[in-house]
Swiss-Prot record:
The lineage of its organism: Eukaryota, Fungi, Dikarya, Ascomycota, Saccharomycotina. A lipid is attached at residue 308 (GPI-anchor amidated aspartate). Induction: Expressed periodically during cell division. Requires ACE2, CBK1, MOB2 and SWI5. Expression is also increased under microgravity conditions. It is found in: Secreted, Cell wall; Membrane. Residues 109-148, 167-200, 215-279 are annotated as: Disordered. Present with 907 molecules/cell in log phase SD medium. This is Protein DSE2. Residues 242-269 have a biased composition (Polar residues). It comes from Saccharomyces cerevisiae (strain ATCC 204508 / S288c) (Baker's yeast). Disulfide bonds: none annotated. Residues 218-241, 270-279 have a biased composition (Low complexity). Keywords: Cell wall, Cell wall biogenesis/degradation, Glycoprotein, GPI-anchor, Lipoprotein, Membrane, Secreted, Signal. The keyword Signal applies. One of its GO terms (molecular function) is glucosidase activity.
Length: 325
C-alpha cells in the first residue's frame, strides 16, 4: 500500500484531536462528515447568595391640640410621637435583581403636656409613670403645706429635689406596651387636676385631684387629704377603651397649727363605675369631670384613637414604605 504524506498527517491530526478532547473537560471537539472541525466550550457560573439590607429611619412628629376650658382659658396639648421604621430588603446579585417586600414597624411614644391657669397662687405638678398589667396597686404619698393666703401653695418635688412646700404624687399603673409620662401644671385654686397614664389601645388610668380651699384668709390652716376611689369605664362605640380613675379631694380646714401636714396613700383599685360615651355622629366625644363646669371636647377622627382623659388622645399609626434597590 502506498500512503502519501497528506494522508499520514490527517490520521495523526485525528488521533491528537481525540486525545485533546479526552484530556480537556471543558472543551469538546467534534468532527462532522464534511471534514470540518467544530468546537464549543461549556461555561458555568455560580450566583452569589442573597444580600439583606436593613435600614432604620427615626423621626419625630409634634402635634398641638388646642383645648378650650369652661372658664374660657385656652390650653394646648402637645403630643410628641416618635416613629421608628425598620426597612428590610432582600437583594440577589444576578443578571436581574429581585427585591422582597418591605416590612415596616412603628413605635409611638406619647408625652402630652397640658397647662392651664388663672391668676391665683396655687400650683401643682404631677408625674405619672406607667408600666405593665392593667390591675396594679400602688400608693401615692402626698404632703402639703398651707400658705399665708386664702388658698394654699402646692409645689412638686421628686427624688433628690427639695422645695419649701412639697407636694409629690407618683403613680405607677399598668399598661400594655406603651410608656406615657404626663406633666400637668394648673394655677386655679379650685379647679380639678387630671392625672393621666395612657396605654396602647385597651386600657388607661386617670387620677383626678380636686383642690377645694376654705374661705378663711388666715395664714393658719391644716390640709386634710381625704382619699376616695372610683372607676370610670369608657364605653365608646369607636374604641371600647376603659378608663380607671381615682378621685382625691384636698379640703383645707381652719386650724391654728401652722406646722401640721396631712399624708395619705391612694390605692389604685376602684369600686364604682361611671359611663362616658360618644354623643354625636361626627365623632365628638364629651368627657365630663366631677365638676360640671370643667370639661373639654375631644374629636375622634380615627378608629385607632381612644380617649384616656379629657385632654389626652392616644393613637397608633403604622407606616408602610416600599424601597427598590
Amino acid at each position: 500500500m502506498k500512503f502519501n504524506f497528506s494522508t499520514i498527517f490527517n490520521i495523526l491530526f485525528f488521533l491528537f484531536t481525540l486525545i485533546e478532547a479526552n484530556s480537556n473537560g471543558e472543551t469538546v471537539k467534534l468532527i462532522t462528515s464534511d471534514g470540518i472541525v467544530y468546537s464549543y466550550a461549556v461555561y458555568t457560573k455560580t450566583l452569589a447568595p442573597a444580600r439583606v439590607v436593613v435600614k432604620t429611619i427615626s423621626y419625630t412628629t409634634t402635634r398641638v391640640y388646642p383645648i378650650t376650658l369652661a372658664n374660657s382659658v385656652v390650653s394646648s396639648t402637645t403630643e410628641k410621637i416618635t416613629e421608628v421604621s425598620t426597612v428590610s430588603a432582600s437583594e440577589q446579585v444576578s443578571a436581574t435583581q429581585t427585591n422582597s417586600l418591605v416590612s415596616t414597624s412603628t413605635v409611638s411614644t406619647i408625652s402630652p403636656t397640658i397647662s392651664s391657669g388663672s391668676s391665683t397662687s396655687s400650683s401643682s405638678t404631677y408625674d405619672i409613670e406607667s408600666s405593665q398589667s392593667i390591675e396594679s396597686s400602688g400608693t401615692s404619698s402626698a404632703t402639703a403645706e398651707p400658705s399665708a393666703s386664702s388658698g394654699f401653695r402646692l409645689t412638686s418635688s421628686s427624688a433628690f429635689v427639695s422645695s419649701t412646700a412639697p407636694f409629690s404624687s407618683q403613680l405607677s399603673s399598668s399598661s400594655s406596651s406603651e410608656t406615657s409620662s404626663s406633666s400637668f401644671s394648673t394655677s386655679s385654686s379650685s379647679a380639678p387636676l387630671s392625672l393621666t397614664s395612657s396605654s396602647s389601645s385597651s386600657s388607661s388610668f386617670a387620677t383626678i385631684i380636686t383642690l377645694a380651699p376654705s374661705s378663711s384668709k388666715s395664714g393658719n390652716s391644716q390640709l386634710t387629704l381625704a382619699s376616695s376611689s372610683s372607676t370610670s369605664a369608657v364605653e365608646s362605640s369607636q374604641t371600647g377603651s376603659t378608663i380607671a380613675r381615682t378621685t382625691s379631694t384636698l379640703v383645707p380646714s381652719s386650724s391654728v397649727d401652722t406646722t401640721s401636714r396631712a399624708t395619705t396613700s391612694m390605692p389604685l383599685e376602684s369600686s364604682s363605675t361611671q359611663s362616658i360615651s360618644v354623643s354625636s355622629s361626627d365623632g365628638t366625644c364629651y368627657v365630663f369631670y366631677d365638676d360640671d363646669d370643667y370639661y373639654s371636647t375631644v374629636y375622634l377622627t380615627n378608629p385607632s384613637q381612644s380617649v384616656d382623659a379629657a385632654t389626652t388622645i392616644t393613637s397608633t399609626n403604622t407606616i408602610y414604605a416600599t424601597v427598590t434597590i
